[in-house]
């Protein structure tokens, strides 16, 4: 990141922050506020924190970072705050998480559900069209 700033490179560093450093909450293992985006200032670049569950927020923030890079504004660190549903590795019992955390996250923050609700309520696409897309994707998965 240092050289990207020194050389004013047109790049975007994307951090997918799921709140855990393997099996330790990042609150216990990361200095500063726990936000990776805050670290960008030390390298002289903008750091942007965005809700990684929100497609449109990520799209907008990434678009601004791309525009900045294309216009000679140098690098950006884009931190997408989100949650993971599965463990850090195959067989991870996730004993470090509250038992109902994943269930609650799936019910309240699922990015696909949020996307579907937003585009259908805004009239951008009909729910039946999304259902058709879902069926086609599931068929492709089944066939592969």
Language model features with spans:
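Glycine-rich ThDP/TPP pyrophosphate-binding loop and its adjacent helix/strand module
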Residues: 1-143
């Amino acid at each position: 990141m240092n050289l990207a700033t020194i050389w004013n490179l047109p790049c975007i560093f994307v951090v997918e922050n799921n709140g855990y450093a393997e099996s330790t909450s990042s609150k216990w293992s990361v200095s500063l506020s726990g936000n990776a985006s805050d670290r960008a200032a030390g390298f002289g670049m903008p750091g942007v924190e965005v809700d990684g569950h929100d497609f449109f927020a990520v799209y907008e923030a990434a678009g601004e970072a791309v525009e900045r890079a294309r216009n000679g504004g140098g690098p950006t660190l884009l931190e997408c705050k989100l949650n993971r549903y599965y463990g850090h590795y195959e067989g991870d019992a996730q004993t470090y998480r509250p038992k109902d955390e994943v269930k609650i996250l799936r019910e309240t923050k699922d990015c696909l559900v949020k996307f579907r609700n937003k585009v259908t309520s805004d009239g951008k696409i009909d729910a039946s069209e999304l259902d058709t897309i879902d069926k086609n994707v599931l068929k492709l998965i089944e066939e592969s």
